[in-house]
C-alpha cells in the first residue's frame, strides 16, 4: 500500500567558519516532524525526532523560534539515525511525500549526500518524483503566485492554525489538515468563493435598479 507522508523539518544555522568543504551549506536539520495519512487523507500516525547536528549550533534566535534547546539536540540521534527511524516507521513500499515548499526535499537530499549516508536505503526519499510541493499547489488553487505562508493558506481555506509554528510535527499536522480539506474539495476556493458569492448577492442588477427608480413615474 502506498504511504502518504507529510514532512516538515526545522534547521539551525551553520556559521561560515564551519562550512567546510564536506559541508558547504548554511543550514543543518535539527528536527524532523512527519504525519502519515491514509488514502482518504485522514491522519493515521505521527513521527517526530530531534536531530543532533554535526556542524551547526542553536543560537538564541533559533531557540526562540523553534523552542529547541542545545540539551535536546545533544541527546538526539544523528541525521542518519533519525532518518533510519523514520523510514522504519513509514515501512517498505511506495510513498508520496508532501512538504510546504521544496526546502525540505532539498535540505534532506543535501545532508544525506554531504554526510555520506547510504543513499540506497534512502532511495524513496531521494527521488524527487515522490515529492509534492503543496505550497505551489495551494498557490495555484488560490491564485497567489508568490510563496504563500502556511498560515495564509489556512486562512484562504477558512481554517485556523493549530499549535505553535516552527515545530516540525505541528507544522506537518497543519499541512496535513490543509491537504485533507483541499483534496476532499477539489473544486472549491473556500474563502474566495464565499466572498464572491456575497459580492454577487449584494450587487443589485442594473435593470432592477432602474426599474425601482422609474416605478410610479408616469411618462
Model-derived features: positions:
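Conserved non-catalytic scaffold segment of RNase H-like nuclease domains
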Residues: 2-110
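Active-site flanking residues adjacent to catalytic metal/cofactor-binding acidic residues
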Residues: 7, 132, 170
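Short, glycine/acidic-enriched loop or turn micro-motifs at the edges of active sites
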Residues: 11-13, 136, 174
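Conserved protein kinase catalytic core
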Residues: 14-16, 139, 177
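Active-site-proximal helix-loop-helix substrate-binding element of RNase H-like nuclease domains
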Residues: 63-66, 73, 136-170
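Substrate-recognition/cap helix-loop segment adjacent to the acidic, metal-dependent catalytic center
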Residues: 103-129
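Alpha-helical transmembrane segments that form the membrane-embedded catalytic/substrate-binding core
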Residues: 168-178
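Acidic two-metal-ion nuclease catalytic site recognized across multiple nuclease folds
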Residues: 177-219
Amino acid at each position: 500500500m502506498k504511504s502518504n507522508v507529510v514532512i516538515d523539518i526545522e534547521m539551525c544555522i551553520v556559521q561560515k567558519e564551519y562550512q567546510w568543504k564536506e559541508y558547504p551549506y548554511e543550514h543543518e536539520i535539527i528536527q524532523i516532524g512527519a504525519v502519515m495519512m491514509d488514502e482518504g487523507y485522514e491522519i493515521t500516525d505521527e513521527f517526530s525526532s530531534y536531530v543532533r547536528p554535526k556542524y551547526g549550533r542553536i543560537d538564541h534566535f533559533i531557540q526562540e523560534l523553534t523552542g529547541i534547546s542545545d540539551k535536546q539536540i545533544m541527546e538526539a540521534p544523528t541525521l542518519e539515525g533519525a532518518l533510519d527511524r523514520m523510514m522504519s516507521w513509514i515501512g517498505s513500499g511506495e510513498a508520496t511525500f508532501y512538504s510546504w515548499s521544496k526546502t525540505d526535499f532539498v535540505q534532506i537530499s543535501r545532508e544525506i549526500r554531504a554526510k555520506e549516508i547510504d543513499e540506497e536505503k534512502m532511495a524513496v526519499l531521494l527521488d524527487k518524483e515522490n515529492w509534492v510541493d503543496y505550497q505551489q499547489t495551494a498557490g495555484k488553487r488560490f491564485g497567489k503566485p508568490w510563496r504563500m505562508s502556511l498560515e495564509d493558506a489556512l486562512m484562504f481555506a477558512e481554517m485556523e492554525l493549530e499549535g505553535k509554528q516552527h515545530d516540525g510535527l505541528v507544522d506537518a499536522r497543519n499541512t496535513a489538515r490543509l491537504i485533507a480539506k483541499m483534496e476532499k474539495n477539489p473544486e472549491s476556493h473556500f474563502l474566495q468563493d464565499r466572498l464572491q458569492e456575497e459580492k454577487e448577492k449584494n450587487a443589485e442588477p442594473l435593470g432592477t435598479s432602474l426599474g425601482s427608480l422609474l416605478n410610479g413615474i408616469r411618462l
